[in-house]
């Protein structure tokens, strides 16, 4: 097997693993949606942060999962990363969020220190007194 074939095989295996992880994570999100609805925790309009640090409105509503409001779950069950590119136009008109494949570990590879299992973030969000700073 050539190096190119080996690299392609590794990439294929990694993609398959990511898909399997996302399926497991989506099941957790679906359970969260049902629990949030049962507890009467209403979704709120989501805001995103541009790379420049400016906060902008989005076209989605949902629940923030991190205190810094960098990730959220939409009321449609989608997972959103809320740090987005944009400029003056986005500051005026807002941004249209695109869903991301949900990970089982939130913030993996990040440097801000707020990483952990998706299940833990979802559970914390259901607890009374949770509020994004």
Question: What spans do the regions from the language model cover?
Answer:
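Generic structural hydrophobic/aromatic packing signal, biased to beta-strands
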Residues: 32, 36, 79, 104-106, ...
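Amphipathic, interaction-prone secondary-structure segments
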Residues: 47-84
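Short linear, low-complexity motifs centered on an aromatic residue
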Residues: 82-94
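N-terminal domain-onset segments
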Residues: 1-58
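Helix-rich interaction surfaces within compact, conserved domain-sized segments
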Residues: 92-133
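Generic structural signal for short, flexible, solvent-exposed coil/loop and linker residues
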Residues: 2, 30-32, 52-54, 60, ...
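Generic structural motif recognizing short loop/turn segments at the entrances and edges of beta-strands
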Residues: 39-44, 69, 77, 100-104
């Amino acid at each position: 097997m050539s190096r190119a074939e080996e690299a392609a095989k590794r990439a294929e295996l990694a993609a398959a693993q990511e898909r399997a992880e996302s399926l497991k994570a989506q099941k957790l999100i679906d359970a969260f949606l049902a629990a949030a609805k049962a507890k009467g925790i209403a979704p709120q309009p989501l805001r995103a942060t541009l790379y420049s640090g400016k906060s902008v409105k989005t076209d989605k509503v949902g629940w923030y999962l991190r205190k810094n409001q960098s990730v959220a779950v939409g009321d449609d069950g989608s997972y959103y990363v809320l740090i987005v590119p944009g400029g003056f136009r986005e500051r005026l008109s807002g941004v249209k969020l695109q869903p991301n494949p949900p990970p089982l570990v939130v913030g993996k590879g990040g440097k801000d220190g707020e990483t952990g299992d998706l299940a833990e973030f979802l559970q914390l969000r259901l607890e009374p007194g949770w509020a994004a700073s």
